[in-house]
Design a protein with these regions (language model features):
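Basic, polyanion-binding surface patches
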Residues: 1-141
Length: 141
């Protein structure tokens, strides 16, 4: 789950393609479809938090963040969120989180591959495994 705040705008997306990209500095890559509204909030210099969900606790946030929301509706209303050192959102169900800053963007067909440097992170639940979301098809979201 990629969560972000930019001024008063908060957003979330389920990231299917996340990968470690570098050791020094620590970095990751995320693929974002060009037609996603969140893409405009992941420009060079923008920050975000990658919330890594637990296999035990991923179903509720998955339901919450994949349902349609009205424009401007707060997806986090009623949630007991915390903030990273860069003031990005951590949800209560997170197993771990990474606070990152976008450094590069590469155009790849109908997606952007975003490279971000990891600035901070923490493991919140060391007794659980990472959730894996299996899609019925990789042809669309």
């Amino acid at each position: 789950r990629v969560l972000f705040r930019s001024n008063n705008i908060k957003g979330a997306m389920l990231a299917s393609w996340v990968s470690q990209a570098s050791f020094s500095p620590p970095g990751l890559s995320i693929a974002v479809a060009k037609d996603r509204s969140v893409e405009s909030l992941l420009q060079i210099g923008d920050s975000f938090a990658l919330n890594i969900l637990s296999e035990k606790d991923f179903k509720e946030p998955l339901k919450r963040f994949t349902k349609p929301f009205a424009p401007g509706e707060d997806r986090f209303q009623g949630m007991d969120i915390e903030l990273t050192p860069n003031e990005q959102i951590i949800i209560p169900e997170a197993l771990a989180w990474l606070d990152a800053s976008v450094k590069e963007r590469m155009e790849c067909g109908d997606h952007w591959v975003i490279y971000a440097e990891v600035l901070h992170g923490n493991i919140l639940k060391s007794d659980s495994l990472t959730a894996v979301h299996h899609r019925k098809t990789g042809a669309n979201y």
